[in-house]
């Protein structure tokens, strides 16, 4: 009958629309993941150019994480947000994550930074992935010299077994300015 044909057509149309929306969302997720992977490779290449010893540190660590962030500062307040991924060197598993931060203090401008975390131990790596992490509200952390040719030369020790390199538009930073920044899993991408 006509009502059954209309019903079947509506069900088919709804299924097609649902599938189209799902496929579009899934393709956007895949595209975002690929953009993060590309940004990760770019950040690592830049780091290795500025600090060749970082390659050894990352290759021999339990894992690493790379985050690209954009910060905006308007007068007395500011913030930054970004995305990245953490890679377990043993399993090669990629976990996609987000970062968000707030900053107080006088300033004006937009800054792009890349943070590269190096996790010496599996427990430090797993804690970062599963529990997230937060830089406190205190001031900047200075990079350790690490000795000539030191494995973590130019990196900042931010927790036991966790070192961070920061790259700005002007090169490898001598301090980490990620205060008030929180890192957590990106449920939409994992």
Task: List where the protein language model places each region.
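N-terminal signal peptide c-region/cleavage motif recognized by signal peptidases
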Residues: 18-20
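Small-residue-enriched, tightly packed secondary-structure blocks
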Residues: 24-190
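Short, linear, compositionally biased motifs with a strong N-terminal bias
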Residues: 12-15
């Amino acid at each position: 009958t006509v009502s059954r044909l209309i019903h079947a057509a509506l069900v088919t149309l709804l299924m097609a629309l649902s599938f189209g929306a799902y496929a579009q969302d899934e393709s956007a997720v895949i595209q975002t993941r690929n953009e993060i992977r590309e940004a990760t490779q770019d950040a690592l290449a830049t780091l290795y150019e500025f600090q060749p010893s970082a390659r050894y540190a990352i290759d021999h660590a339990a894992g690493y994480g790379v985050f690209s962030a954009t910060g905006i500062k308007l007068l007395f307040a500011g913030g930054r947000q970004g995305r990245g991924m953490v890679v377990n060197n043993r399993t090669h598993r990629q976990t996609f994550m987000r970062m968000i931060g707030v900053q107080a203090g006088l300033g004006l401008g937009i800054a792009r930074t890349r943070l590269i975390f190096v996790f010496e131990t599996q427990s430090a790596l797993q804690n970062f992935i599963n529990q997230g992490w937060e830089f406190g509200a205190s001031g900047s952390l200075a990079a350790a010299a690490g000795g000539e040719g030191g494995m973590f030369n130019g990196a900042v020790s931010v927790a036991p077994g966790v070192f961070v390199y920061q790259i700005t538009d002007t090169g490898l930073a001598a301090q980490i300015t990620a205060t008030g920044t929180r890192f957590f899993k990106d449920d939409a991408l994992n």
